[in-house]
Amino acid sequence: EAIYEKLDMLISTFFTEIGNELIKEFSSANEFKASTSYLKAIPNWDDAEYDKQLKKLKNANIDFNVDIEGGKRAEFLINLRTLLKSKREFLINLINNPQLFEKEEFSGLLISILHLDEELEHRPDLNQITDTDFNHLNGDIKRIYSKLIYEWIYYLKYLNTHYPYMISLIIRTNPFDEDADVHIKD
């Protein structure tokens, strides 16, 4: 039980450090926003709904395609590379934590993120990305996106069960809701 509690705390730290930001970046660029629009409704979920969503997402391949043209592609990729590079040490420290062997799906997510980081780092001039190369990177992002959403729902269920006072902030800053606002309203 204590090992799983520590593992859940590591996952929570991941979302605080980088996971929520990745979801926000990927979701804002996703051509298929409708495929995740139901994730705006999380304030109304109970444990049964979390379990239902986790079961649905376990092996799901969520519709995803970066819908950015021309010069904005390079800007998106440069910003993504900067984010990943700034969190590289954190990600490597996470993946070196032996407790993560207990959570194979999360380890797979970290490996996918580090792979994308490496792909972007090996491209010194992201302004020169061809459509074919961009499509390859889009595939890497899609792989991360599906895993990231599953782990995010798992994380929310954990917070809802063990730390319900913490989930309020997540709901107010929901990365799937472009109108989300951290401020508490009447």
Regions found by a protein language model. Name each.
Residues F76-D186:
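Soluble C-terminal extramembrane regulatory/interaction domains of multi-pass membrane proteins
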Residues A2-K87:
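Membrane-proximal, non-transmembrane interface segments of integral membrane proteins
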